Amino acid sequence: MSERKYFGTDGVRAVAGEFPLTAGWVLNLGAAAGEVLKRRGERPSVVIGKDTRQSGDMLEAALAAGLTSRGVTVIHVGVLPTPGVSYLTRHLGADAGVVISASHNPYADNGIKFFGADGQKLTDATELAIEAAIDEVPNFAPVTGAALGSVTNYTEAERLYIQFLREHAPDLSGLKVAMDCANGAAYRVGPKVFQAAGADVFAVYTTPDGHNINRGCGSTHLEHLQRIVREGDYDLGVAFDGDADRALFVDSRGNVVHGDHMLLLNARARRDRAVVTTIMANMALEVKLREAGIPLERTAVGDRYVHERLHEQGLTLGGEQSGHVLFLDVAPTGDGVLTALLTLSAMKRLGTTLDELHDELVMFPQTLVNVRVGNKKAIARDEVVRAAVQEAEARLRGRGRVNLRPSGTENLIRVMVEGPDEAEIHEIARTLAGVVEKRGRVEV
């Protein structure tokens, strides 16, 4: 595969106003994307949505200008969660969708992520074709007159997305819910859907000003929501991130209920034949799923790897501790509001509560030791290190796990040991780190 110049694992992301997220470059990106889409058919259409960042307006205008300059019809859906844009791309039969968001990042950042007509992330081949076309924009043949594209503001977008979510909502009558909308894309959708399902909702961080998205709030800053739930008479709390593709819960006592808990609850209710998560999921989840007869498959860190494994194995349920949970039999992307609704539906079906779920899934202690080495790739292949890992795993006898992985940015090996006995895992981690450090000093 060719090396990427602009697209990362989640589209293009940077500080808005700095390269590549300048108005000029984004205009060229739109023109390049439009040209690639035109190769597949005349008059393609593209749905564009955004979160609440101030820079979204500038990027949206530049992208739309580029797309329409190549004859593309642009459908603006306004502020909407990322999965809402995915849904509307499919629902409206558009050729592609675009989300302008940087998810849980600070407001100064922004990003541009494309969806295909199926509502899923663009294929690598299509992204690479767009990248190649960016450099050719000055050489494109002019598009003029009636061949130019147009822009439509689609005012039914929020209503249609809410209608889709309500189809998957359980009866929440009598449930008192505190909700943190992160001053982000779910600030209207989240409360409306839960209220329509019958919940008594107290929503906070629903006044975006372009600068306050994710600031001390949302799924990465649960402290205020925990305090609200503890001090008020709430059954639970739920928090979304800036683009609402993930959700985390707080039980009635203020304890965090994260992705591991949600995967266990939903897998039991759905009787999935297997669940996919990453190497960061706690061993306690694996043990509980094993007791229920449900295998757990692990991938590298990142929701894209979970998504890929689900497709490869023909599975539908997977996710991460961060609250990014995939229900591929319901939607092709992670959806925070949908995740919350389906989790509460599973809770009702099994006759349990988030408090009981939190207390049942007791997380195994975990220790992480960073070891600086000369050649992190060589260490990962070293036979002495591998033998030490096997010895550590044998000592845990299936009651825990060991994971060594190189840092993505530094010459470090991260030694992680997890198990029910805290003293034992600390001792194992120290021993293993010592072997890694010693081998890291020699040519391996």
Swiss-Prot record:
The keyword Phosphoprotein applies. Its cofactor is Mg(2+). Activated by phosphorylation. It is an enzyme of class 5 (isomerase). Mg(2+) binds at residues 103, 241, 243, 245. Binds 1 Mg(2+) ion per subunit. The modification Phosphoserine is found at residue 103. Its EC number is 5.4.2.10. One of its GO terms (biological process) is peptidoglycan biosynthetic process. The keyword Flavoprotein does not apply. One of its GO terms (molecular function) is phosphomannomutase activity. It holds the Pfam family PGM_PMM_III. Keywords: Isomerase, Magnesium, Metal-binding, Phosphoprotein. Belongs to the phosphohexose mutase family. This is Phosphoglucosamine mutase. The lineage of its organism: Bacteria, Thermotogati, Deinococcota, Deinococci, Deinococcales.
